[in-house]
C-alpha cells in the first residue's frame, strides 16, 4: 500500500517539482546544478518551474531534463510520461539556407561592380587615346600647312629675285663714283711738276693729267673695301640679335614686333640663322628638339615643348641692358 501511494504521489508531482525536491535532498543549489550541467541558472529555474522557453527547442529541453535527472539520481523512466506532457516533440522549423543564397547574391553584385569598373576604365582609356590622336593629328596638319606656306613663299621669292642684279649693279656704280672723284685734288701737283721739267703741248698735258688722275683712283679703290665689309658685319653686333643653330631639319617662322616676318621656311641640319629685328620676337617652331636658340647672349629654354612633343609658340621679350 505504501509503495502504491508513493507511486501515485510521484505521478501527481510534475517533472520540475520532482527535480527540485531531489536537488534539495542532495543539498545542491541551482547555481551548482547550472555549473555542472553547463547551463544558465535561468534555464535550471525554468525547468523546475515547468516552463518551456519559447526560444529553446523541445529536443534540447528534453535533453536538459534527462541530464538534470541523472545528476539528482531520479530514474528517467519515471519522468518520461511527464516529459511527453510537458515538452511534446514539435516539428522543428527549418530556416531556409540564407548563407548560400546571400553569398550568391553578393558574388553576383560583385561581378556587376567589377564589370562596371572595367567598363569605366575602358571608356577613360578610349577617351584619352582619342584626345591624344586628335591633338597629334592637328599638330601634323598644322606643320604640313606651315610647310606648304613656306614653300609658297620660297617660290614667290625665287620669282621676284630676278631683279636683284639690277640693284647690285647700281650699288656698285654708286660705290665706284666716290673713288674716282676722290683723287681729283692731286692733278695740280702733277701738272705743275710736268711744266717745270719740260714744256709739252696742251694735248699731251691733258693725257698725262688723265693718266695720273686714273692711277690714284686705282690705288684708292681698294681702301674703300674694308669700310663696306665693316658695314656688312655691323648688324651681327646687335644686342637683340637672335641666333639659332639647327641639329636636324626644322620648320621655323620668326616675326618681330612690327609684324614683319624675319624668316619663314625650312632650315636644314647643321644650319645657322642670325636674325635682327625689333623685339619682342614671336617664334613658331615645328620641331623644338632640333633647334638651339640664343637671345641676348642667353640660351632659350625649350624643354617644356620638347617633353610634350608639340609645336613651340613663344615670345621673346627684350631685357633692358645695364647702363655702362
Swiss-Prot record:
SMART domains under this entry? HTH_XRE (SM00530)
Query: Which Pfam family, any one, appears in the UniProt record?
Result: RodZ_C
Which keywords does this Swiss-Prot/TrEMBL entry list?
A: Cell inner membrane, Cell membrane, Cell shape, DNA-binding, Membrane, Signal-anchor, Transmembrane, Transmembrane helix
What GO annotations for molecular function exist for this entry?
A: DNA binding
Record region (Disordered) = 155-191, 211-231
Q: Where do the HTH cro/C1-type domain residues begin and end?
A: 19-71
Query: Which sequence ranges are listed under topological domain Cytoplasmic?
Result: 1-111
Coiled coil segments of this chain: none
Membrane-crossing segments per the record: 112-132
Membrane topology (UniProt): Single-pass type II membrane protein
GO cellular component terms, alphabetically, are: plasma membrane
List the CDD domains: HTH_XRE
Q: Where is this chain compositionally biased, Low complexity type?
A: 167-188
- Indicate where this protein resides in the cell: Cell inner membrane
Give the matching PROSITE patterns: HTH_CROC1
User: Could you tell me which residue ranges are on the Periplasmic side of the membrane?
Assistant: 133-324
Residue intervals annotated as DNA-binding region are 30-49
Domain characteristics, as noted in the entry: The helix-turn-helix (HTH) motif in the cytoplasmic domain of the N-terminus is involved in the formation of spirals to maintain the rigid rod shape. As this protein is anchored in the cytoplasmic membrane, the HTH motif may contribute to protein-protein interactions to form the RodZ helix, which is localized beneath the cytoplasmic membrane. The C-terminal domain may be critical for determination of the rod shape by probably interacting with enzymes required for synthesis of the peptidoglycan layer, including PBPs in the periplasm.
* Assigned protein family: Belongs to the RodZ family.
Cite the HAMAP family for this sequence.
RodZ
Physiological role: Cytoskeletal protein that is involved in cell-shape control through regulation of the length of the long axis.
Protein's name according to its UniProt entry: Cytoskeleton protein RodZ
Encoding gene per record:
rodZ
Amino acid at each position: 500500500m505504501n509503495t502504491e501511494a508513493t507511486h501515485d504521489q510521484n505521478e501527481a508531482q510534475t517533472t520540475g517539482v520532482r527535480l527540485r525536491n531531489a536537488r534539495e535532498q542532495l543539498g545542491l543549489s541551482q547555481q551548482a546544478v547550472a555549473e555542472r550541467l553547463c547551463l544558465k541558472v535561468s534555464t535550471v529555474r525554468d525547468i523546475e518551474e515547468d516552463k518551456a522557453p519559447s526560444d529553446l527547442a523541445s529536443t534540447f529541453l528534453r535533453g536538459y531534463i534527462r541530464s538534470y535527472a541523472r545528476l539528482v539520481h531520479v530514474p528517467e523512466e519515471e519522468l518520461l510520461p511527464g516529459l511527453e506532457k510537458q515538452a511534446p516533440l514539435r516539428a522543428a522549423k527549418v530556416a531556409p539556407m540564407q548563407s548560400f543564397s546571400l553569398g550568391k547574391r553578393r558574388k553576383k553584385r560583385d561581378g556587376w561592380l567589377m564589370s562596371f569598373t572595367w567598363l569605366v576604365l575602358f571608356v577613360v582609356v578610349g577617351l584619352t587615346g582619342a584626345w591624344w590622336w586628335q591633338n597629334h593629328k592637328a599638330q601634323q596638319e598644322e606643320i604640313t600647312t606651315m610647310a606648304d606656306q613656306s614653300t609658297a613663299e620660297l617660290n614667290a621669292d625665287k620669282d621676284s629675285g630676278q631683279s636683284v642684279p639690277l640693284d647690285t649693279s647700281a650699288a656698285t656704280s654708286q660705290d665706284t663714283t666716290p673713288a674716282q672723284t676722290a683723287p681729283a685734288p692731286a692733278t695740280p701737283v702733277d701738272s705743275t711738276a710736268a711744266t717745270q721739267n719740260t714744256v709739252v703741248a696742251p694735248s699731251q698735258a691733258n693725257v698725262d693729267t688723265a693718266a695720273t688722275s686714273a692711277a690714284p683712283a686705282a690705288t684708292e679703290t681698294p681702301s674703300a673695301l674694308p669700310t663696306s665689309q665693316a658695314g656688312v658685319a655691323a648688324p651681327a653686333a646687335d644686342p637683340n640679335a637672335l641666333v639659332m643653330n639647327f641639329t636636324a631639319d626644322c620648320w621655323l617662322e620668326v616675326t618681330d614686333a612690327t609684324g614683319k616676318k624675319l624668316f619663314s621656311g625650312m632650315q636644314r641640319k647643321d644650319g645657322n640663322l642670325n636674325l635682327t629685328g625689333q623685339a619682342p620676337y614671336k617664334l613658331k617652331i615645328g620641331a623644338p628638339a632640333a633647334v638651339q636658340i640664343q637671345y641676348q647672349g642667353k640660351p632659350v629654354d625649350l624643354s617644356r615643348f620638347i617633353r610634350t612633343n608639340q609645336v613651340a609658340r613663344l615670345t621673346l621679350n627684350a631685357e633692358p641692358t645695364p647702363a655702362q
